[in-house]
């Protein structure tokens, strides 16, 4: 499961540094380059709920292997692509494969580890590997594009995919929902896709086409109508794709909301901090990617120790404290100016990474305990989808705030660099406020229902645990924002 997570996370941001090389090789237009990135994100986000429900109905291992096969073969096609059309199509199919396999990864972990300590350790490893993929993506992409043919950024997935498929076939048992809830809700599947596809499209393309463009307004309208239809269908269906009663759980709703706040903040800031490093401090793309390595390593380290902290302090305190560390890290960034050196950046990176790593495993465990195991796949898919959409919203909203402040500074006579820095700092302050609200949300919704102490979570019922989304990766698509670094013409 960790190998699969590494591969899909890596594919979200490994293309960033290689984009100029791909453009020269395939003679792509700017619009074509955008779709090399966007096609993957569009199909991934649009089909996550479908993948999660199919995993519950037809078997988590089966869907995982199907997704892995699709992802691996499409990686081969992308690596060998000789034209922009073939590459964009292959990237879209990669997103389909990722949408099938990702919801199944944590559902399989839940089914495979019945002991809470072992399960928490497995989730910590999963999160740490994802964080390492974040760090490795820009570095691997830069090295490959500099020394080898760009296609190898996709071809490296092929042996990993084959090995993962073989390991899964040999060592992973099949699991699925009980027969009573294994009927496929086809209208719900269609409505969910019709809601997520246009919403994702509008969030990706709105900045380029203009938020009032007919196609963007139409996409938002279609998403709203489809989402309303989805809720009506799910409320009236005997065997719904998504049991709306899941959201009556304080832990599930609060945990999902906390993850959305986390994703909104971390993915938006990841994107604009990349711009700050390159456009204000003069970092090269590869150097900017390397600058995030200490943060990703802190995510991995603190994800590994988070279970011990949670066992002593409880999930609500651990998650809230992790978000406090993230707030402090961003506050340090808000103090940086035009002449900041890397030693000035490092404390903020490390605190932010430590907080992100510390909060995600306990957050995942808390949400897992609020959901029936039979709904593991769809619970994972819901959190994946909410994380994807929240991350894109983070880029969109923080970007709008940045550009508004930047424009005001330019009108006041500031030079472009100072104007961008002013907008960046404003975006940081808004994100700090949002994460501070997340501290309260997580503490209040994840606290135990009884007054009993929570030093040992093994007393909790193990048979009703479920799963969650991509944990500790500021990826993210994991790393949807990192992918977007190359495609926002409105930022200087």
Could you say what each language-model-derived stretch is?
Residues 128, 132-148, 197, 201, ...:
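A gly/Pro-rich, aromatic-decorated transmembrane alpha-helix motif that marks the paired
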Residues 178-181, 445-492:
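Intrinsic disorder in cytosolic terminal tails and internal cytosolic loops
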Residues 177-182, 239-245, 369, 410-413, ...:
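Short, Lys/Arg-enriched, Gly/Pro-containing loop segments at transmembrane-helix junctions
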Residues 20, 52-53, 141-142, 200, ...:
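Small-residue-mediated transmembrane helix hinge/kink sites in multi-pass secondary transporters
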Residues 58-68, 84-85, 101-105, 112-125, ...:
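C-terminal module of multi-pass small-molecule transporters
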Residues 158-177, 193-205, 222-237, 438-448:
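C-terminal membrane-cytosol helix-exit motif in multi-pass small-molecule transporters
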Residues 1-170, 304-305, 313, 319-327, ...:
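Transmembrane-helix bundle of Major Facilitator Superfamily
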Residues 1-43, 149, 187, 212-229, ...:
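Transmembrane core module of solute transporters
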């Amino acid at each position: 499961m960790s190998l699969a997570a590494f591969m899909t996370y890596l594919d979200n941001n490994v293309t960033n540094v290689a984009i100029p090389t791909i453009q020269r090789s395939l003679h792509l237009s700017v619009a074509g380059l955008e779709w090399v990135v966007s096609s993957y994100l569009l199909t991934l986000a649009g089909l996550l709920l479908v993948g999660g429900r199919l995993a519950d109905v037809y078997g988590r291992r089966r869907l995982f292997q199907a997704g892995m096969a699709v992802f691996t073969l499409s990686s081969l096609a992308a690596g060998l692509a000789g034209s922009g059309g073939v590459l964009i199509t292959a990237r879209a199919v990669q997103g389909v494969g990722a949408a099938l396999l990702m919801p199944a990864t944590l559902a399989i972990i839940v089914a495979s580890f019945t002991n809470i300590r072992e399960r928490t350790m497995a989730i910590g490893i999963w999160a740490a590997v994802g964080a390492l993929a974040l760090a490795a993506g820009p570095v691997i992409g830069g090295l490959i594009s500099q020394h080898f043919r760009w296609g190898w950024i996709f071809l490296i997935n092929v042996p990993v995919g084959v090995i993962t498929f073989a390991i899964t076939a040999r060592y992973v048992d099949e699991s699925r929902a009980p027969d009573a809830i294994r009927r496929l809700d086809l209208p719900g599947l269609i409505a969910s896709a019709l809601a997520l596809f246009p919403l994702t499209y509008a969030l990706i393309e709105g900045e380029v086409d203009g938020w009032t463009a007919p196609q963007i307004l139409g996409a938002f309208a279609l998403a709203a109508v489809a989402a309303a239809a989805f809720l009506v269908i799910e409320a009236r269906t005997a065997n719904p794709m998504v049991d709306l009663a899941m959201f009556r759980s304080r832990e599930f709703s609060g945990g999902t909301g906390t993850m959305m706040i986390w994703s909104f903040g971390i993915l938006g800031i990841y994107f604009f901090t990349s711009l700050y490093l390159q456009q204000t401090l003069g970092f090269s793309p590869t150097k900017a990617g390397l600058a995030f390595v200490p943060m990703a390593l802190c995510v991995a380290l603190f994800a590994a120790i988070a279970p011990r902290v949670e066992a002593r302090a409880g999930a609500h305190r651990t998650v809230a404290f992790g978000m406090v560390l993230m707030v402090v890290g961003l506050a340090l960034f808000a103090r940086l100016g035009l002449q900041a050196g890397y030693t000035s950046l490092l404390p903020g990176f490390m605190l932010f990474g430590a907080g992100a790593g510390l909060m995600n495993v306990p957050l995942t465990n808390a949400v897992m305990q609020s959901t029936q195991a039979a709904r593991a796949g769809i619970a994972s898919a819901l959190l994946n989808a909410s994380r994807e959409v929240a991350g894109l919203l983070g880029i969109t909203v923080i970007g709008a705030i940045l550009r508004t402040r930047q424009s005001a500074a330019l009108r006041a006579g500031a030079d472009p660099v100072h104007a961008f820095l002013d907008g960046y700092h404003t975006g940081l302050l808004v994100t700090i406020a949002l994460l501070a609200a997340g501290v309260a949300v997580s503490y209040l919704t994840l606290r135990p229902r009884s007054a009993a102490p929570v030093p040992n979570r093994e007393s909790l019922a193990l048979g009703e645990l479920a799963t969650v989304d991509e944990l500790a990766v500021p990826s993210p698509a994991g790393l949807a924002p990192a992918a977007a670094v190359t495609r926002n013409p409105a930022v200087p």
